[in-house]
Amino acid sequence: MSLTTLSATEVIARLHEFDSVIDARSEGEFEEDHLPGAVNWPTLNNDERRDIGTLYKQVNAFEAKKRGAAIAARNIASHIEREVINKPRDWKPLAYCWRGGQRSGALSLILSQIGFRVTLLEGGYKAFRAAVVHDIPRLVGTLEWRVVCGTTGSGKTRLLQALAAQGAQVLDLEALANHRSSVLGAIPGLAQPTQKRFDTLVWNALRPLDVTRPVFIESESKKVGNVSVPPSLIEAMRQSPCLNLVLPDAERVALLLEDYAFFVQDIEHFCERLQVLAEFRGKVVVAGWLASVRAGNIAPVVQQLLTQHYDPVYLQSMQRNFLRFENAKVISPSDHSVAAMNSLAQQLLQNLAT
């Protein structure tokens, strides 16, 4: 029997050594957040965990443990039959639950008695979460940041994608958050991660970055949709050198009509989101936008959204929060196309190399 216990810090340093990372918590807990690359083998599923918890409160711990053990044994047997039967002798799994207790302990004990070299995460997910929160500021502080600024529709995301495609280091917070970071930024069909999940995604994206090379990041606000950017990252961004991406208004409108095509295809959804802006622009102005959109005049509304709402708010935020924005290097692609962004990215990287 081989069963080893490691601290969260040790596990993080050795994650690459495990053949599988097994989360023994319920599917609901797993969905909220989990270790990178983890698979979910619930010792108790959502309903079972709720029922056992009720038994604990309404009867007593002994009866709850008996019932829980019976359910857990069946579930572990099912996982072994489905997932473990064909594993080789040298398979090395890591297992964890909420606090590294009974759920992952039972699974780990059985796997180790089979003959596998099993590692148990001491303190479980709770310890991992604490380690991630502690580690993010350290990782952020080791990196050299280049902040891509620019008004809405200037192509910041396209430029980041072009930079990444050409080998640059990029941290795309909007991609991690499944949100385009504005009142109209929700992406249909894509739910945002929980705050804990977002933190883990950011942390995991930071880990492989090379401290000797700059990292490009968009000038995000403190929140991207419903999730908050780690404070240490916000602070680092606001003190780092900036690039100011500039496009003519007509190009910005064209880009937004492409990237937000789902609004054009679902006018009522667009109108629903526009109504949120009544608080900021007034009911009369928004009513005019709604009428224009429903009449098919979308481009003029987008133009007014930029000049009357997004641009003033964005520029005020940049000047107030990003200390080096005033001295930002202005960069201008020839147009809003992907090809133009690729060309601009190439120029930027060439300039960095010289």
Per-region residue spans from a language model:
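Flexible, polar/low-complexity N-terminal or interdomain linker segments that lie immediately upstream
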Residues: M1-P36, A64, V133-G141, W145-C149
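Positively charged, proline/Ser/Thr-rich regional signature most characteristic
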Residues: L15-P88
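Hydrophobic/aromatic beta-strand patches that form the interior of the parallel beta-sheet core
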Residues: I22, V39, L94, T119, ...
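Catalytic cysteine-centered active loop of the rhodanese-like fold, especially the PTP/DSP P-loop
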Residues: R67-E122
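A short glycine-rich beta-strand->turn/loop micro-motif centered on a GG-aromatic cluster
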Residues: L94, F116-A130, D172-A177
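Glycine-rich phosphate-binding P-loop
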Residues: G101-R103, E144-A165
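Conserved nucleotide-sensing/catalytic segment adjacent to the nucleotide-binding pocket
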Residues: A165-A236
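Conserved NTP phosphate-binding and transfer environment spanning the P-loop NTPase/kinase superfamily
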Residues: E235-T354
